[in-house]
């Protein structure tokens, strides 16, 4: 919604779920636009005063982890939208997740910079990628490719066959889950990690949730990085150098679906009746390393510096210090593991020659 800042008068409304006749309406199949919602912008909005454009990052569609009731790509869910601030007209948009069921809400404000690549807007995402566009035209600064992704085995779910992945910058965090990412400080710790994940479905970044009692025998699908926690604090950038700094952490969640009616029974006081055929089960199995280690290789949290003039990574450093609970494990006695990072994320400030950040020490204090 747009209002006159001086008078408070209402100026315009932009429908984030396109109505009949509006651009993107066809991405809501089976008339699902009529009863689906929750597309909003919980991250801050950015603006270019000279262009008169506002840049709005959006979240996904109701509900997380199952989308059989809203087939289609579902514009403008999990997108970056550029609107004319005076009229509310769409200048351009880019959808970063088609038919988002992974809780990959766009979590931070878009960053505006003038670089050697031109006037850009850079959007960091939970997926571990930064999407970079010319902020006037919406053209990607570097190619973004539609990459094939696995289909869902859950009845009624129709995932997009592809998802848009930037060719540059490279991912700033691990994406997906695989044996190669499991902790391997010693062969025995790696063996234990493999055993811990044996009953879970590993896979790429857009690994689909699976239903309980799946015919594969797996307990749940691993979603890595988890859509809830990996990047919730805003990146910062130095406008002089064009360098962006992102603090992130890698963690996974396990997702299994049950029937909508069964999902309601997990809550003592449900707010209503679930109409979805499937919904995420509350609680449920999650893999744990028997030694008390994180299952995945460090760094547990990191800061990545990306040159947005070139799209290249400049450096990566662990954020914080190795937790005492990791350093003091008997299984690691006499083994040099280096600084793993704390596993916590915090705030950052960039100056002309310094990057200042908050995190926690090895004993968990700020």
Regions found by a protein language model. Name each.
Residues 1-366:
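Beta-sheet-rich non-transmembrane sensory/scaffold domains
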């Amino acid at each position: 919604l747009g209002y006159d800042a001086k008078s408070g008068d209402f100026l315009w409304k932009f429908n984030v779920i396109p109505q009949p006749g509006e651009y993107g309406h066809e991405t809501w199949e089976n008339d699902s636009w009529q009863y689906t919602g929750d597309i909003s912008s919980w991250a801050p909005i950015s603006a270019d005063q000279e262009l008169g454009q506002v840049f709005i990052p959006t979240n996904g569609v109701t509900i997380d982890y199952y989308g059989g009731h809203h087939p289609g790509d579902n514009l403008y869910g999990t997108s970056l939208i550029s609107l004319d601030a005076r009229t509310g007209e769409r200048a351009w948009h880019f959808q970063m997740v088609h038919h988002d069921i992974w809780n990959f809400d766009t979590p931070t404000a878009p960053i505006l910079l003038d670089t050697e690549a031109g006037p850009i807007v850079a959007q960091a995402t939970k997926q571990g990628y930064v999407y970079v566009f010319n902020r006037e035209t919406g053209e990607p600064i570097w190619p973004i490719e539609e990459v094939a992704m696995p289909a869902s085995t859950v009845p009624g779910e129709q995932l997009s066959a592809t998802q848009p992945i930037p060719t540059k910058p490279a991912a700033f965090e691990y994406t997906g889950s695989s044996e190669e990412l499991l902790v391997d400080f010693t062969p025995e710790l790696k063996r234990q990690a493999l055993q811990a994940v044996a009953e879970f479905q590993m896979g790429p970044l857009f690994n689909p949730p699976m239903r309980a009692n799946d015919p594969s025998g797996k307990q749940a699908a691993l979603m890595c990085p988890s859509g809830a926690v990996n990047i919730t604090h805003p990146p910062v950038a130095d406008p002089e150098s064009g360098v962006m700094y992102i603090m992130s952490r890698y963690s996974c969640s396990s997702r299994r679906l049950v029937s909508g009616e069964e999902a309601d029974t997990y809550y003592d006081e449900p707010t209503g009746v679930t109409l979805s055929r499937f919904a995420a089960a509350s609680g449920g199995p999650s893999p744990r390393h028997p030694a008390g280690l994180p299952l995945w290789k460090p760094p547990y949290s990191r800061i990545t510096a990306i040159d947005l003039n070139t799209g290249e990574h400049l450096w990566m450093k662990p954020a914080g210090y190795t937790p005492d609970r990791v350093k003091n494990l008997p299984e690691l006695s006499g083994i040099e593991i280096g600084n793993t990072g704390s596993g916590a994320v915090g705030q950052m400030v960039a100056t002309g020659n310094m990057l200042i950040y908050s995190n926690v020490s090895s004993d968990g204090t700020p």
